[in-house]
């Protein structure tokens, strides 16, 4: 009965207790026995457990007997809370009619809480506020209720007070889900339409598609048609996660479950696509999701050049489960063969790098992250540049446009001054500032390349960890940008090039040259480290040579003898400098990030 189905997500900022609440709900509904129950059941990746974050959306179909005696099917769809994975949140919400908005009763409303809640409201989802961690001594429910009403603008007087850790208030949450979240709309007799909300690769059965059936009924043995690429597949198995996979005889309108149909390639089962039947196809596909574009790019190079093929294989395997990871081969004079990879943000980059090192045993050199720039040439052609070393000659460029984001920062009022100073220093333009109780909401326009560098770390340090940030892409905007090159012994190192704003280019060049001088190990000859904009050198530092005391064996004696030995040493150093190769350590490539973070 479609009337007795409830589809809901849990949305929250990181660390507000979302995964713990999901664990308690699963336990309460008997989804897993106490023996099988472990912390963060839905976070299946080791990395998710260690960092205490959710990266991929997971689901659980649970049966709950309400106090009115009716048995309900509750489909819980877990969502990530980090800004990098906000597109996963919008995907999960599109399969739901309701969402639990979990807010930490001691921390209060934070930036991602606001962003995810607005996403839910835009998608027409019923939002139920829940105050978690009510058992903490620092919990202040009245203040947090006022914040929810002021900042988000939804009624929160009736918000439930719970503690996911102790299990207090869980039955009230389930009753509220049944009472307030509407049942799914959909017709079982209509042609099949199912929305793919996630897909991943399983080494035994191929691609597993997680779908929300909107209309119709789906049974094993039926021939499926994917509406975007018109590909046909035979449906082999359908089922639900409870949270372990359980096969079913059918999935009908309103339900969330999985389809296995022997697809070998994840590109064929695109998230946001509509699945229908070959014999009785639907006339219109469902509204999908916008294609997610990478925001941050970095070069990944193997330390050993013979590991290149292994790195390609590892990236391809990772892409099977992470469709938002983009990569293409690239060559660097300094680092050899590697890949230019596109990520959703810095956390995504960090996680991909860690998974490559852990799961695939790779030793990597990662170049400093950059963003995409639009370059308009004199002939009117627009090219997108994600690698600074590929920037065309300045003489052929009409203008360079950089990506600008709208950042929403929530910060306690005592740190507002420091945060405003930080944003202004990063070329930010204030758009809005709103006081809400003890919190202040600042809205800034910021260039994305300033945010990518070290903005997040600095924001946390100037606010003692209390500020939270959420951002979305706004537009490409013309800016006065130049390419800063680093030369080591008069050789340009392409992997160290970066694009900076002209106003701060000289200072950046000086700081970078000084940093390089500290990091490059001393050799037997002098090394010149220069920062250049075009042909113009803006900074120079020398790494002094190590030298042997060739006069140690001369006790007294003639000055000409000493001079002869020194001249001989000097000639040897000169020859060495001409043929000598300078090893650049990995730390030097990351120095670009820490340049102004002294």
UniProtKB/Swiss-Prot annotation:
A GO molecular-function annotation: translation elongation factor activity
InterPro entries recorded: EF-4, EFG_III/V, EFG_V-like, EFTu-like_2, G_TR_CS, LepA_C_sf, LepA_CTD, LepA_IV
Known EC number: 3.6.5.n1
Task of the protein: Required for accurate and efficient protein synthesis under certain stress conditions. May act as a fidelity factor of the translation reaction, by catalyzing a one-codon backward translocation of tRNAs on improperly translocated ribosomes. Back-translocation proceeds from a post-translocation (POST) complex to a pre-translocation (PRE) complex, thus giving elongation factor G a second chance to translocate the tRNAs correctly. Binds to ribosomes in a GTP-dependent manner.
Membrane topology, from the record: Peripheral membrane protein
Keywords associated with the record: Cell inner membrane, Cell membrane, GTP-binding, Hydrolase, Membrane, Nucleotide-binding, Protein biosynthesis
Protein name: Elongation factor 4
Substrates-to-products reaction catalysed: GTP + H2O = GDP + phosphate + H(+)
CDD domains referenced in this protein's UniProt entry, alphabetically: EF4_II, EF4_III, LepA, lepA_C
GO cellular component, one term: plasma membrane
Source superkingdom: Bacteria
Organism for this UniProt entry: Nitrosomonas eutropha (strain DSM 101675 / C91 / Nm57)
Domain tr-type G, first and last residues per copy: 3-185
Family under the similarity heading: Belongs to the TRAFAC class translation factor GTPase superfamily. Classic translation factor GTPase family. LepA subfamily.
Biological processes annotated in GO: positive regulation of translation
């Amino acid at each position: 009965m479609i009337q007795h189905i409830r589809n809901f997500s849990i949305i929250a900022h990181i660390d507000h207790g979302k995964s713990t609440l999901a664990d308690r709900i699963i336990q309460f509904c008997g989804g897993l026995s106490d023996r099988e129950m472990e912390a963060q059941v839905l976070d299946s990746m080791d990395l998710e457990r260690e960092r205490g974050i959710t990266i991929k959306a997971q689901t659980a179909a649970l049966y709950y007997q309400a106090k009115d005696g009716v048995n309900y099917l509750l489909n819980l769809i877990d969502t990530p809370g980090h800004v990098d994975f906000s597109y996963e949140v919008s995907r999960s919400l599109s399969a739901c009619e309701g969402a639990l908005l979990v807010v930490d009763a001691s921390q209060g409303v934070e930036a991602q809480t606001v962003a995810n809640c607005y996403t839910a409201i835009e998608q027409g989802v019923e939002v139920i506020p829940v105050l978690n961690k009510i058992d903490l001594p620092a919990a202040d429910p009245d203040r947090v209720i006022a914040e929810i009403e002021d900042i988000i603008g939804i009624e929160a007087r009736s918000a439930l007070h719970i503690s996911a850790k102790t299990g207090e208030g869980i039955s009230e949450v389930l009753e509220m889900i049944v009472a307030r979240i509407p049942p799914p709309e959909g017709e079982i007799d209509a042609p099949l339409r199912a929305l793919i909300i996630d897909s991943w690769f399983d080494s035994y059965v191929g691609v597993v598609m997680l779908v929300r059936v909107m209309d119709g009924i789906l049974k094993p043995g039926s021939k499926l048609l994917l509406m975007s690429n018109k590909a046909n597949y035979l449906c082999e198995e359908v089922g639900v996660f409870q949270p372990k996979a359980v096969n079913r005889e059918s999935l009908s309108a309103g339900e969330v479950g999985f389809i296995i149909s022997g697809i070998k390639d994840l590109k064929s089962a695109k998230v946001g696509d509509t699945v229908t039947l070959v014999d009785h196809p639907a006339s219109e596909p469902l509204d999908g999701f916008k294609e997610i574009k990478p925001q941050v790019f970095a070069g990944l190079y193997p330390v050993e050049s013979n590991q290149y093929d292994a790195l390609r294989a590892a990236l391809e395997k990772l892409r099977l489960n992470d469709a938002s990871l983009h990569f293409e081969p690239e060559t660097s004079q300094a680092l050899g063969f590697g890949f230019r990879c596109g990520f959703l943000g810095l956390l995504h980059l960090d996680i991909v790098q860690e998974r490559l090192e852990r799961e695939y045993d790779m030793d990597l050199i990662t170049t400093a992250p950059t963003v995409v720039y639009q370059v308009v040439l004199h002939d009117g052609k627009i090219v997108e540049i994600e690698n600074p070393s590929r920037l065309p000659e300045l003489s052929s460029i009409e203008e360079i446009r950089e990506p600008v984001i709208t950042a929403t920062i929530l910060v306690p009022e005592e740190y507002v001054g420091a945060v405003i100073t930080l944003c202004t220093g990063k070329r930010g333009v204030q758009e809005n500032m709103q006081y809400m109780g003890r919190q202040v909401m600042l809205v800034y326009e910021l260039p994305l390349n300033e945010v990518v560098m070290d903005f997040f770390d600095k924001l946390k340090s100037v606010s003692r960890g209390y500020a939270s940030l959420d951002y979305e892409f706004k537009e490409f905007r013309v800016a006065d940008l130049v390419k800063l090159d680093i030369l080591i012994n008069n050789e340009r190192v392409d992997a160290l090039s970066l694009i900076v704003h002209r106003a701060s280019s000289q200072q950046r060049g000086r700081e970078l040259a000084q940093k390089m001088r500290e990091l490059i190990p001393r050799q037997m000859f002098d090394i010149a480290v220069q920062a250049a904009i075009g042909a113009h050198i803006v900074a120079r530092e020398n790494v002094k040579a190590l030298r042997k005391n060739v006069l140690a064996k001369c006790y007294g004696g003639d000055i000409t003898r000493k001079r002869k030995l020194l001249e001989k040493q000097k000639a040897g150093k000169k020859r060495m400098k001409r043929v000598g190769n300078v090893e650049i350590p990995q730390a030097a490539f990351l120095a670009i990030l820490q340049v102004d973070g002294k």
